[in-house]
Amino acid sequence: MSTTAKEAPSSLFSLLPNDIVLNILARVPRWYHPILSCVSKNLRFLVSSSELKITRSLLEKDRFYVCFQEHSNSPSLTTYHWFSFTENRRCLVSIPFTSPVEPYFATLTLGPEIYFVGKSRSMWILDSRSGKLRQGPRPLVACDQAAVGLVNDKIYVFGGIDDMNKRYYEGIHAQVFDLKTQTWHVGPNLSVKLACLNRSVVTPSLGRKIYVRGTDRDVTIYDIKDGKCDKIIPADDFSSGDMCVVDNVIYMYYHNVGLMWYESKEKQWSVVHGLEFNGVFNSIAIAEYNGKLAFLWHDRNKREIWCAMINLYGSSKVAIRGRVEWSHRLLSDLPSNYNFKHFTICTDY
């Protein structure tokens, strides 16, 4: 085969109009986007464009789910209730998802699947398309109150202690699940001890390290290569505990300040300007959704769940502004013994 023939498919693809290319890219799973960005400058531009996010939104490629934990006097009677967000009606609809029996501490989504880890020496995987639950390969050790992160087709589970004895299980601080080989192995031990963790995110623009929010209110940066940990000083003592990444920028909500973003070069938190709903909310949950920031809160007085969809714009090198695209009540008459358990985004239907 001649060189011209080998290059023909790539050349023909580059000649297609951008609107056709966008429709093709919108149907490609998001975890392939970093690879596509390396093909050409035009593809790199289109993969990160707002037009692609809008196209994916119209195709309903991303969906978000909310799980509530129904508390009872007996731990064995604790139940979980799942709801799916319906965008055209802007409401939460109850769905018959099956949850693991154990109160799993951490979740991680990979495409349409939700992984549950922590609390016991097991891992469960929920397929959001079928609602079916299956058990995955057993972790090396159990871990209570641990954090998870996904980097390069590997799930990192780290931190967490034996809640009874207040020590790390068998001296293992971190364990890694290889999605390709479906096997677990010991990961780089953390250079500091992190007992209680409650949120983690990964951002490719910052060296594919894992950022973890702990109960000490600090954010710890875990380096997957050697286990080295650095700390980010919190902007305020009253944060929501939840954080997310939108376009490779980390966001966190602070009750006394508002929504903030992390400026990695200066190593400081800055306020997202232009938002008027800053205040004290109960049970905050935030996540990236179609390139926007979905901001959920629980109004306990009215027993309602509300959501604001926020557009973020500006430069992470200068300033970032936010604009509320819409704010709407998603659920009413929520029982008083229901609490937020999981808020997760599944992609690529």
From Swiss-Prot:
Residues 11-58 form the F-box domain. Kelch repeats lie at residues 154-204. It holds the Pfam family Kelch_FKB95. InterPro entries: F-box-like_dom_sf, F-box/kelch-repeat_ARATH, F-box_dom, Kelch-typ_b-propeller. Coiled coil: none annotated. Keywords: Kelch repeat. This is Putative F-box/kelch-repeat protein At4g02310. It comes from Arabidopsis thaliana (Mouse-ear cress).
